[in-house]
Amino acid sequence: MSNTKQAPKVGFVSLGCPKNLVDSERILTQLRTEGYDVVPSYDDAEVVVVNTCGFIDSAVQESLEAIGEALAENGKVIVTGCLGAKENQIREIHPKVLEITGPHAYEEVLGHVHKYVEKPTHNPFTSLVPAQGVKLTPRHYAYLKISEGCNHRCTFCIIPSMRGDLVSRPIGEVLAEAKRLKEAGVKEILVISQDTSAYGVDVKHRTGFYDGMPVKTSMVALCEELAKLGMWVRLHYVYPYPHVDDVIPLMRDGKVLPYLDIPLQHASPRILKLMKRPGTVERTLERIQKWREICPEITLRSTFIVGFPGETEEEFQMLLDFIDKAELDRVGCFKYSPVEGAKANELPDPVPEEVQEERFQRFMELQQQVSIRKLARKVGKEMLVLIDEVDEEGATGRSAADAPEIDGLVYLNGETGLKPGDMVKVRIDEADEYDLWASLID
């Protein structure tokens, strides 16, 4: 009979965006390394960690509900993440929470776990922690966070008050992590941060070192080095700064996926100014045209806000005109929602909810027509697809134009012999508003 003491269990709940997911992965990796058994439930857990989101009101509500559920089911709860920056708000509703920390407070979270759950002396799990750490994504893709915080002060956003100003990770550290992911079988890396294009600004783009070689701390240099690893490299949260133009040739040459996620937010100069967002419509359209001339295969994704305080019908029409002219491939749209602490809340002339809804519907109808046009042009074309899921009906994957969770899918009906992580060549047979259907090419 074994007298090995069972590892203490820590429950874990992760909410919010991919950047928060990466924070969760880091905490989980350390907990596993120290010998804790991390479980996705409250049953038998000696304490529960809830990594929260606090960006918009609906996310705050979801986080508060998750904390409440953990308290009801378990009773011992440690809170971290963006909402943790608003400790008073949490304590007011959930006074029995044990400890609260803000975002990326990894060491503090671990210290709190040690306080309430004895640190294992015998560690049966250390040898089971993979070199790339614990990942919450499927094995074939992973998020690579290159910085924390943001230097922008957009009036609708409170991220800087939660996560602070931009702090870039050392480029050698980022590239070493990417290499470990490659060695673990990852086929696609999704580069994320609050502002990927600002990578290195805080350290004046100083030279770092990777494998003994000097590398400049910049987005372009990072992309050039990541390209050497031979994975799909997808760029998210890229502001339209001039130096972004330097990445487009890398996309044309197949070194980085021809995909840019650029949160433009609006097209009216006045609304953009009220939002404290960079860029002008004319210049943005010019650059999009230039990018497409250099790299015809480029996929452009963006997000927009409708119903921002003071938005007139004329200004909303400017946004619709931009959507029609720009023909962006993938678009997300949000109705403006006041976020506690955001400067935009102080702006006059809030747009009534029914007007917001009506504009949202008009926006999405137009974008759907754009998407139908764009995807119809892909029928008959050949492309590579990365398989995400396989079931009894067939396989589902994504092309270079599709990021996980937010973009379209490629369906391969009847292809049950494939497995997640397979990279296959297909011919597109059909298209609808957002997705494609394809056949394997032998």
From Swiss-Prot:
Radical SAM core domain ranges (all copies): 136-373
PANTHER family referenced in this protein's UniProt entry, alphabetically: RIBOSOMAL PROTEIN S12 METHYLTHIOTRANSFERASE RIMO (PTHR43837), RIBOSOMAL PROTEIN US12 METHYLTHIOTRANSFERASE RIMO (PTHR43837:SF1)
InterPro entries noted in UniProt: Elp3/MiaA/NifB-like_rSAM, Methylthiotransferase, Methylthiotransferase_CS, Methylthiotransferase_N, Methylthiotransferase_N_sf, NA-bd_OB-fold, Ribosomal_uS12_MeSTrfase_RimO, rSAM
The entry's keywords: 4Fe-4S, Cytoplasm, Iron, Iron-sulfur, Metal-binding, S-adenosyl-L-methionine, Transferase
GO cellular component: cytosol
Note on how the cofactor is bound: Binds 2 [4Fe-4S] clusters. One cluster is coordinated with 3 cysteines and an exchangeable S-adenosyl-L-methionine.
Cofactor: [4Fe-4S] cluster
Superkingdom as given in the UniProt entry: Bacteria
TRAM domain residues: 376-442
CDD domains associated with the record: Radical_SAM (cd01335)
Binding site for [4Fe-4S] cluster 1: C17, C53, C82
GO biological process, any: tRNA modification
Protein name per the record: Ribosomal protein uS12 methylthiotransferase RimO
GO molecular function, a single term: protein methylthiotransferase activity
Subcellular location(s) of the protein: Cytoplasm
NCBIfam families found in the cross-reference section: 30S ribosomal protein S12 methylthiotransferase RimO, MiaB/RimO family radical SAM methylthiotransferase
Binding of [4Fe-4S] cluster 2, residues: C150, C154, C157
Role summary: Catalyzes the methylthiolation of an aspartic acid residue of ribosomal protein uS12.
